[in-house]
Amino acid sequence: MIKAFENHEIWFVTGAQLLYGGDAVVQVDGHSSAMVDGMNASGLLPIKVVYKGTANSSKEVADLMTAAEADKKCVGVITWMHTFSPAKMWIHGMQILRKPLLHLHTQFNKEIPWDTMDMDFMNLNQSAHGDREYAH
């Protein structure tokens, strides 16, 4: 970690929704935590990334962005849409956030499991048009 960033952090927030049930959100949290752990363990980032949870509603997004704005240690936010997270759910929160934003447009898995892919996998791992809308 670069000394200039030792008292700062970047927040990682995952977007999802409860459409697919609580079990899916638990899996989303696991994937998100693994990504953040991997980022921090890589030694490639000059700053610590802190997982702040999965936002499943407009209120949760707005609350997280308000907290990010108020926290002097937070210098920016990384967002990742794991399951289908409607872009409109993020509008108010993005209007609150004035710190730098990085949006990851990717999936959790390194490889797509073409041979075993089913609708449960698709529902858990899609971000679909909500992710694309969010990026704009």
Where are these regions (language model features)?
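Metallocofactor- and cofactor-centric catalytic cores in central/energy metabolism, strongly enriched
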Residues: 1-136
